[in-house]
From Swiss-Prot:
This is DNA-directed RNA polymerase subunit beta. The keyword Transcription applies. Pfam families: RNA_pol_Rpb2_1, RNA_pol_Rpb2_2, RNA_pol_Rpb2_3, RNA_pol_Rpb2_45, RNA_pol_Rpb2_6, RNA_pol_Rpb2_7. GO terms for molecular function: DNA binding; DNA-directed RNA polymerase activity; ribonucleoside binding. One of its GO terms (cellular component) is DNA-directed RNA polymerase complex. One of its GO terms (biological process) is DNA-templated transcription. Belongs to the RNA polymerase beta chain family. Keywords: DNA-directed RNA polymerase, Nucleotidyltransferase, Transcription, Transferase. The RNAP catalytic core consists of 2 alpha, 1 beta, 1 beta' and 1 omega subunit. When a sigma factor is associated with the core the holoenzyme is formed, which can initiate transcription. Its EC number is 2.7.7.6. NCBIfam families: PRK00405.1, rpoB.
Amino acid sequence: MAYSIANNHLLRKNFATIKNIIDIPNLIDIQKNSYRRFLQSDVPLDLRKNIGLEAVFRSVFPIKDFSETSSLEYVSYTLSKPKYDVEECHQRGMTYAAPMKVKVRLVIWDSGKESGVRGVKDIKEQEVYFGEIPLMTENGTFIINGTERVIVSQLHRSPGVFFDHDKGKTHSSGKVLYSARVIPYRGSWLDFEFDHKDILFVRIDRRRKMPATVLLKALGYSVEHLLNYYYKSEQIYIAAGELRKGIEPELLTMQKAVVDVADANGEVIVKANRKFTKASIKKLLDHGVTSIPTSSESIIGRYASADVVDPVTGEILLECNQELTADKLDELRQKEVTTFNLLYIDGLNVTSSFRDTLLADKISSSDEALIEIYRRLRPGDPPTLKSSLALFDNLFFNPERYDLSAVGRLKLNFKLGLKVWPDCTILNGPTMLTAAELQNAEQLIGSLLNGTRPVDLALKDRLSSDLTKSLKKLDLKQPVPERLLEQLADELNSAVANAEFFQRDLIAGLELPESFIKLMDLIEQGGYDENRRRIEGLRRNRMLLEVAYGDSVECCNRNDILEIVRYLIELKNGRGAIDDIDHLGNRRVRAVGELLENQYRIGLVRMERAIKERMSLQEVENLMPHDLINSKPVSAVVKEFFGSSQLSQFMDQTNPLSEVTHKRRLSALGPGGLTRERAGFEVRDVHPTHYGRVCPIETPEGPNIGLIASLSTYARINEHGFVETPYRLVREGQVTSEVKFFSALEEEGHAIAQANALVDQDGRFINEYVSARKSGEFVLVQRDEIELMDVAPKQLVSVAAALIPFLENDDANRALMGSNMQRQAVPLLRADSPLVGTGMERIVAKDSGVSVIARHNGVVDAVDAGRIVIKIDEEEYDETGTGVDIYNLVKFSRSNQNTCINQKPVVKVGDKVKRGDVIADGPSTDMGELALGQNIIVAFMPWGGYNFEDSILVSERLTKDDRYTSIHIEEFECVARDTKLGKEEITADIPNLGEEALKDLDESGIIRIGAEVKPGDILVGKITPKGETQLSPEEKLLRAIFGEKAGDVRDTSLTIPPGVEGTVIGAKVFSRKGNDKDARTELIEKIEEEKLRKDEQDEVRIIRDSARGKLKRLLVGKTAGAKIEDRHGVTVLAKGKKITDELLESLTMDRWATISVSDGTDVEEKVAEVLSKLNEQVELIRGVFDDKVQKLRRGDDLPPGVIKMVKVYVAIKRKLQVGDKMAGRHGNKGVVSRILPEEDMPYMDDGRPVEIVLNPLGVPSRMNVGQILETHLGWAAKGLGWKIQKMLEEHTSEENLKKFIRETYDNADFNKILDTMDREELLLVARRLSRGVPMASPVFEGAGEAKIKELLTRAGFATNGQVTLFDGRTGEPFKHKVTVGIMYVLKLHHLVDDKIHARSIGPYSLVTQQPLGGKAQFGGQRLGEMEVWAMEAYGCSYALQEFLTVKSDDVSGRTRMYEAIVKGKHTLEPGLPESFNVLIKELQSLCLDVELLEGDE
């Protein structure tokens, strides 16, 4: 235990007060889990869920031809092993991908014209190659064409229904207009909106609007049905001339009594003009009152909710939705109508908007409505009923065209309170209903038809028996769920009671069970039409078909649309709430898997069209599946997605933090998302639901602010794509350690306490009132009302922000800069983990994948700079094939940002390692912790103006000690192609070049490793054939002397570009298969092969040793059952003697198998078993390594036309210099202004100089006080380290040393470990602590002021952290004391070397003839209008003339100047700038006749 502490640097003094409840989930799980779900590659074929790739195949297949005589069905897919591993893909510029094979089945049907029954004629099954699919590496990235890329997760609007209003901005009256929008995952959008006259309109796909009732009528609803669906009605009785109305308790509470209302005894219960209350209504009902008197005034002007019919003649007296006038009332009295129904609309609680919409809608029947919709969507096409029906059906009810998705259905049901379950699809299949269910069929159907409405019993019986018979014929895959049958019951009842029936044309297209056809016949013939004026066909009763027959519930259905309209009307009436689009319950994350799934679907749909055409054109019977399938469209779509999608990004590999953050990024941009220009303020803003899900701090500055966010530390994404955050459950004021994840919707309405709320030992809240969050507000609630509690204070922020100590003391804007700048820190030569950290450093380093983590428990067997060999513990043997783990470390490899990736071992031979331990550090990691910068002694004081405006004064000591030196690796590539004129050749034999230029090239023309190179040096010599030209006499002479070679080739060697100076650290040669290898290639191959052989030998050796140990344990001490001979036949041990260790050592291992033992059971069998297993393992290892060697010797796959490709890697050492950008972790950034000699820096009274001087004025206005607290705490940490150093120098006793360390840490767990340490371990720990005691000050629970002061005192410093400094130049003390301390300072990727460049001549722009701009174009420095004024002000007329003519765009002047310099004349003859000619041409193009007249006049 102690050893692992000393070894693994677990020594941070932590200031956290809240104990760790739950570990932070793996930081890159968002990527890995998503892709794992998508591929399901490790799931057996028959257990794969219908998600990801599997779901795409199942949704597109089966593919039928147009005549439906054949169909292509999907069976399964399998992935093979990738051709190249990750490392090879990097080097060769390949994509890391696995070949995919899909098993498909081609079924050919017999048309069955004679028999009338369709039968299967032929079935062919085959595996078809389906292109390659990129695989994710262990670190959550993809390798596409040799570069590492990340697919960023997209944050988009969730499918579902959204209700909103225009905030009164649309109409001049300022009236609030409500609207609803149904957004599917894919398919047509449906919008409902009110206009200022309160008429409800609908738009399909944002086309022209029409009354919403047109859509409802097209769904097959009658006017009467709709009115009664959205409005309640009151029954009016006419008895003996008196008007009375029935008691409807719901409606009465909204009304006043017109006259006194009395019971049968005449006791007045409600007086006139008084409101009805719940109590008074209950009293009326208790007294047996069923109707109350009303006046004719109160009912005149209201509308009929159903047709009122003359009881004698059957004539309609009052139509549905017709207004009741005084004349009509009199007519009803005359015709002796006793009762009729009126709609209840009071204009306050129930508005007439829907009734007005019905009135405004001039369409009377369902058919007209369908045709009207067709006209709106396809203006110009002549509509027919059939085409209108087909179009409407495809809009919302066809699963191929319209997909709400499981999430959309979930959101819709959640919002509208519907009960359509995402899992209630019943598929046709071979299995029958179970016997028990068949017995219950009668009973089932009886219960099915027990409805609320009256039904003819005879009809019910007929229906029942018929349904039972046909249920027996139904071949349902699974039993019909109860809830489904209940739903079917309601539908059937309403169908029977309203005498609505299905029309045949709808059914014809569907293969319905017989029972439904029979049902419809019965309903149609049920004799219910005698009392109806007309039967309105219920064309769209899709719900019944859908739920009973098992279509996808991920389509829209009639009920949804009715309910959406109902909710919208309720909103209008002041009930319900609108949705907040920025709420994280309304936004969801599409991670890699889902993004790729969508692309794959696009590709498969394209492929489907092609297959259908092929099936129709060719004779299918003679074809196999592979003749029909061409997977090119699918591969092309996938390739395009990974190569050029907006969300597929070049991985930011500057340092481990930038990698992790890039993989955890959430972007609102991208296809199907927002655009920068359109996104307003609200979308970008922080929302209460972001708490614990999305970081409020980390987002880019600039146009993308708020659109790109980062996942919070503990957040994860659930299967629906919503971001979840963990909370501890609280029961009756008691905090439990049970943790549950909540999405933003689930957390709504809960009272959530902060993580730092005070609790006692038992987890009960100490304070009576606790500060909590509830529905996005901060509230004080009683402790018993708290339901949840945060798990940790850092739950709020992202990984980068959680790495900033004292974040709580920084202004948010600066914290944002701090978290963004940490991602730009360059990995330094010597990583140094921060003295003041937050405790997150280890987690980031481990999850980023840059350091090497032990895969098993074991013992380190061998270590060198390039590899670690670990012998695995025996109890872990079964998992791995062999007992050895070999870790080949990455050495000086180039990252995407040209920084250096280098791994260094941190273990030594004999160390015990546990699974999950860090055994090698990567870039920017120090003993398994993230280390982006250096701990520097800083002083806050002005110094000679060198820290004006955030400049930084740096001591030369830092460059001398290479504290800020970084290595950058550039890759240069040279390609030899086969040209029309002949082959290019890579060679050292280059014409017209001296010995000096070629001194570092080997005979193959490639530079040697270790060569120092500067701009213009040749890296790879290459010659290209020249076209045949007329030869000059000189060339003819050269040809005659030197033969052909010199004349017909030109030098096209790869040279170093300007601004690059470094050391060659590697070269790789790739040659086409079949070409002869040059000496360099053979050398490289030999080195690689030696490495492989060494690995092989180590594995075999360790396995042999392990087997030898096992055999010795079996044999030593046993009695020989027969004499033992060596291979020469000499007896080495007589029978009956004990076997010893020495004896076994004298024999070869294969002779051990021949030893027979007299005591101990089955020893010989065990020995044989161990030896046979050993031989198997050795064979296996040798096989694997032979394959690798074969692969190495094979030629390479190069692009067409390429013969050979050489890559050269140059390492550039960048020291810190003036102009480099540096920053702290608190957004305090600056540029190095001067590197001052060590002796001139301000120094302390003990002679120690400070290393960096910062401007104190950079703190107050920026409000990032965190940097000051960090400086103080760092100073205390360093001071304590110096004290320990002093104790070590003075050889203090072990006890005193332990005591000091124990008091410093003040941690019970650490004290236990300290007590178990022996002297050696203690000294190791003390030596490490002497550099400074590392502290962890986690965000929002960091060290307080009192704690820092206490530590400063303990370290022997003043509590204000200030020191007297002396001027290094004069030795005088500065007047005031200065704040000095340790700050963690980073060097950022904006290096001056990458920006500075010089040009004298270079490329010019084609049109203006002015020099190009920028370093990449080797351009010049622009001299603008204001610079010209400055030159004029100085009076530098000649210099200015030169700038504006010969140095810019005076073409003839340039050549004259060149000639003048060559001839030694120093005169300037400027000509006419080219831009003048351009101006003239521009004016001429505007038809202005402008010309320049030259001459004397």
